[in-house]
């Protein structure tokens, strides 16, 4: 049996993955998380960036390799159709792109960050600093956090040779434009869980940081108590007096 916690722990010790991950949220979404102990897994085609999950096809494969792939993918042995298709590059590319999209649509994706103090993310994802930022200890829920990918930021699209290596398709899910580098993003992937709620361990939620404009502090604290989030510590983000940054300080109940 695979020891998921040990694998994550080894990755943390080697500096390959973070021990804690953060998730910004509006108050309404935060309440749903606390009520259900579940997180929404998005599908690849629901992201707000139109460049997200873009890729460039690497067509370095032979007619025979394409024919074998086509017959396997369509579960037929009609090699003549495959060879006729191979002569039309545009049709080949369209066929491959459809196959890639079929593969990607099965993955549920949840986005996290290693940075709980980013002004832009507080504004964008925590509704103008009125929301919260959740802090998760990944070792306290190895089942949820086992399939973890660090996002790679590039100026050019990922090159993908789907015919020779279908398994590399998942790389598309971890690449995005350099413009988003400030997000310091990590993603949890769940095969077969796109557009679904997936449960997480209450113990893994170890801190809630209230935004500097958050007015729902008491209600969120009450919900944590009512729904069994006993490990949560509370903090408050406040504007610094002399610089463009946030100061996070612990709260006492």
Task: Identify what each model region corresponds to.
Residues 1-253:
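Partner-binding and oligomerization surfaces adjacent to conserved cores of proteins
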């Amino acid at each position: 049996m695979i020891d998921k916690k040990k694998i994550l722990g080894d990755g943390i010790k080697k500096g390959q993955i973070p021990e804690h991950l953060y998730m910004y949220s509006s108050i309404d979404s935060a309440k749903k998380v606390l009520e259900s102990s579940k997180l929404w897994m998005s599908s690849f085609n629901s992201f707000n960036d139109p460049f997200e999950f873009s890729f460039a096809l690497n067509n370095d494969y032979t007619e025979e390799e394409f024919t074998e792939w086509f017959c396997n993918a369509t579960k037929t042995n009609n090699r003549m159709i495959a060879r006729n298709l191979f002569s039309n590059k545009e049709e080949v590319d369209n066929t491959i792109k459809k196959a890639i999209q079929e593969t990607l649509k099965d993955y549920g994706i949840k986005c996290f960050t290693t940075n709980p103090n980013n002004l832009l993310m507080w504004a964008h994802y925590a509704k103008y600093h009125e929301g919260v930022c959740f802090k998760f200890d990944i070792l306290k829920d190895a089942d949820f956090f086992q399939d973890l990918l660090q996002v790679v930021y590039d100026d050019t699209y990922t090159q993908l040779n789907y015919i020779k290596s279908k398994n590399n398709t998942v790389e598309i899910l971890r690449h995005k434009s350099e413009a988003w580098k400030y997000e310091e993003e990590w993603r949890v992937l769940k095969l077969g869980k796109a557009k679904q709620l997936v449960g997480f361990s209450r113990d893994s939620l170890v801190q809630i940081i209230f935004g500097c404009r958050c007015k729902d502090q008491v209600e969120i604290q009450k919900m944590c108590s009512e729904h069994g989030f006993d490990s949560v510590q509370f903090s408050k983000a406040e504007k610094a007096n002399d610089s463009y940054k946030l100061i996070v300080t612990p709260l006492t109940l």
